[in-house]
A protein has these predicted regions:
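Polytopic membrane enzymes that build or remodel cell-surface glycoconjugates and lipids
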Residues: 1-298, 311-316, 322, 327-332, ...
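C-terminal luminal/periplasmic domains and tails of membrane-associated envelope-modifying transferases
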Residues: 251-256, 264-517
């Protein structure tokens, strides 16, 4: 009873399985009690305390527990529709799931490395052969045909009951049953029933060796699928480490109370913005004294109109993460963009407003991930890196146990540090970083990352170097011509290019088209 109670409170997805306990009790008692009346009485007696626990849990969950994302008002039950939805889920979690297992690991669209494909193939082949022989060695006796047939039907009915019961809490909460992330987590309660159903299907194969070989093949395929899933998460974790390290280079110290805004572009398909909220807090607040978070991280499209009321200045921001809370204001915001192969960028309305001039046609091969999503444009005026990022903190060391050692310094290191120096107008440092990077030689994947170096060279009188970088950048991505035009026009208006502006006209002639400033 204690274990059952802990299970109910520990993982509410599973409470529907508690409804199937009478079926297990019935199968266990049937051989010893031939009388139907006695069986019903015995099952009722044994199940009564578990039913009391279940009813008590449901009362607490629905009427007493208020601090939850899924409020009681969102729960809706339709007796007419419940059977349809429960039955519709069975082919998805059984046949659909196994179809995915067969198709996913070796699909050419997955993009697995040849070495991983070789490992998975070896596991599939060796696992099938070894497991088939191992399973056969476990058979020590033959079950009588008549008894086997009766037992098989019992297990079929029990497996169906388990699958139907598994879907009850999901139906009540109106959760969809899908095989894609993140809804695939709702298939977890079905594991027991689907496994039992598969075992029943395998029992229909009379030839032992064929039955065991097929079972071994399915188990081996499941193993390769788990390896594939582990590789997906490993790759995404490496990408998160890359994100974190570039953020640390660009912002070695962020003022507490800062809200970071970004946009979900599918770079991290298995993480949401809440995961990055805690990543940022673990890095910049290594010894929190309270449950109040000093930083938060929002995807604009997911939070706008909710925790993020508007994109106007002076709006209060509050987010309850259950285990911690954040209180901030739209007056203290950093706008971030991360879309590999481009480096991470903390956007500045002074330097980045012109990037939005570039077209964003997804069919344009020159664009891809190299421009900013339109949703960031409205938030750009709120971003204020000058006030909320420390000018210099080279001693910043995020926890190694979490983020690992600093990786080898590549192009993005020099870009992030140059962008940090540009933030405070340290143009000499920007040129020094550029000289080192270009002499290695490093080059950006995103032409927009030439901008700080072009501006620094121009401001320090190295006009030819600035012009050369402009030509290289535009040659790599002609769609950004207007962005570079805007940079040169701004420099000319500040008098950086001299009184005659002859150099500006030369640049404009090369670029071919420049909008009127």
């Amino acid at each position: 009873l204690i274990i059952s109670l802990l299970s109910l409170f520990g993982l509410e997805y599973l409470f529907g399985l508690e409804l199937t306990r009478p079926f297990f009790l019935w199968l266990a008692i049937s051989p010893t009690l031939p009388s139907l009346k006695e069986r019903i009485k015995k099952v009722s007696l044994f199940y009564a305390p578990y039913l009391a626990l279940l009813l008590g849990y449901l009362y607490w969950r629905i009427f007493l527990y208020k601090s939850t994302i899924y409020a009681v008002g969102e729960i809706s039950i339709s007796v007419a529709g419940i059977w349809t939805q429960l039955w519709d889920a069975i082919p998805i979690v059984s046949l659909g799931a196994w179809q995915k297992v067969f198709m996913q690991p070796f699909s050419p669209e997955i993009g697995l490395s040849p070495r991983l494909v070789l490992v998975m193939g070896a596991i599939l082949l060796a696992g099938t052969l070894l497991l088939a022989n191992f399973l056969k060695s476990l058979v020590t006796y033959e079950v009588e045909a008549s008894k086997k047939k009766k037992t098989d039907w019992d297990w079929l009915l029990l497996s169906l009951a388990l699958m139907l019961g598994a879907g009850v809490p999901l139906y009540i909460a109106n959760f969809p049953i899908k095989l894609t992330f993140p809804e695939d987590r709702f298939t977890f309660p079905y594991i027991f029933g689907v496994s039992m159903f598969l075992t029943w299907l395998l029992s229909l194969i009379k030839n032992e060796m064929q039955r065991f070989t097929l079972a071994a093949l399915l188990i081996s395929l499941a193993i390769t699928t788990h390896i594939h899933n582990a590789d997906i998460y490993r790759s995404e974790w490496r990408l998160q480490q890359l994100f974190a390290q570039q953020l640390f280079w660009r912002a070695p110290n962020i003022t507490p109370g800062t809200l970071i805004l970004a946009e979900d572009e599918g770079v991290f398909p298995h993480n949401d913005d809440e995961a990055f909220s805690f990543l940022v807090n673990w890095a910049y607040d290594t010894e929190p004294a309270t449950s109040e978070l000093k930083y938060d991280y929002f995807y604009i499209s997911g939070r706008l109109g909710e925790e993020l009321p508007t994109l106007e200045k002076g709006e209060p921001v509050y987010k309850d993460h259950l285990s911690a809370t954040f209180t901030g204001n739209t007056n203290q915001i950093l706008l971030l963009h991360f879309s590999p192969p481009s480096c991470l960028r903390i956007l500045d309305p002074i330097y980045d407003k012109d990037v939005f001039i570039a077209p964003r046609d997804i069919e344009n091969p020159n664009m891809g991930t190299l421009t900013l999503p339109r949703v960031l444009e409205a938030a750009l005026p709120l971003s204020n890196p000058r006030d909320f990022i420390a000018k210099n903190n080279d001693d910043f060391n995020p926890p190694i146990w979490l983020f690992g050692e600093e990786p080898e310094r590549s192009w993005c290191y020099y870009f992030e540090k140059a962008d940090l120096a540009r933030q405070v107008g340290d143009w000499e440092k920007v040129t020094k970083l550029g000289d080192i990077a270009f002499n290695i030689p490093y080059a950006p994947a995103d032409s927009a990352e030439y901008l700080p170096f072009i501006e620094a060279y121009a401001r320090l009188g190295r006009h030819e170097d600035a012009q050369l970088l402009t030509e290289i950048a535009v040659d790599k991505n002609p769609a950004l011509r207007t962005t570079f035009c805007s940079l040169w026009q701004r420099l000319a208006m500040e008098g950086i290019l001299g009184k005659s502006n002859a150099f500006l006209y030369e640049i404009q002639d090369f670029l071919g088209y420049c909008p009127t400033p």
